[in-house]
Amino acid sequence: MSIKYVASSTLPTPWGVFDMHGFEDTETGKEHVALTFGVLDAETPTLGRIHSECLTGDALFSLRCDCGFQLQTAMQNIAEAGQGFILYLRQEGRGIGLLNKIRAYELQDQGANTVEANEKLGFAADMRKYDMILPMMEKIGIKQVSLMTNNPRKVKAMQELGIEVVQRIPLQVGKNRYNEAYLKTKSTELGHMMSEHHFSTDGES
């Protein structure tokens, strides 16, 4: 994989002004983004998140998943901490692409869960890769991470690339009546680490 840094700019947001760094995978043509906030120090743990693209959740405010809620909460947490980063990876639909994701949603509307839908379409449950994050991390100057995630695969991916994950910070937000079954499937079949309280019927997270 060949990741090339392209350019940087400021990105004003409701939570503060981030810096946006653009990268291109010259083999696939995919474009990835790193957002940074504040002054980053390679020698101290930095609050951060690896976030895979979710057009429906991030931009269209879908309640079928928790992605948009996680992205916004991560940005807010970083702004409140005064420094941090988000790697925004173009891996829509856990790596199957937008149109296949819509096909999977159609199967879910007919009763399949998120894993079953992917498999019925001939895909693995999660096809994402994370090898592109190392050159992105090197460019923004981060070696130690306090990682906001419920996904143990992201922790493992960073560790295998030689990035020290000092701690994992749960990011349990956005549960609602449309995505509760989806969140349960992520926990029971994909190994995401979520507390039982997150699935209680007493209110919504």
Swiss-Prot record:
General function of this protein: Catalyzes the conversion of GTP to 2,5-diamino-6-ribosylamino-4(3H)-pyrimidinone 5'-phosphate (DARP), formate and pyrophosphate.
Q: Which organism is it from?
A: Shewanella woodyi (strain ATCC 51908 / MS32)
Q: How many and how are cofactors bound here?
A: Binds 1 zinc ion per subunit.
> To which pathway does this protein belong?
Cofactor biosynthesis; riboflavin biosynthesis; 5-amino-6-(D-ribitylamino)uracil from GTP: step 1/4
State any single GO MF term.
zinc ion binding
Q: Cite the binding residues for GTP.
A: R49, I50, H51, S52, E53, Q70, E92, G93, R94, T114, T149, K154
Name of protein: GTP cyclohydrolase-2
Q: Which Pfam families match?
A: GTP_cyclohydro2
Q: Which GO terms describe its cellular component?
A: cytosol
Instruction: Extract the HAMAP family matched here.
Output: RibA
- GO biological process annotations for this chain's record? riboflavin biosynthetic process
Instruction: Tell me which EC number(s) this protein carries.
Output: 3.5.4.25
- Reaction catalysed? GTP + 4 H2O = 2,5-diamino-6-hydroxy-4-(5-phosphoribosylamino)-pyrimidine + formate + 2 phosphate + 3 H(+)
Q: Where is the active site?
A: D126, R128
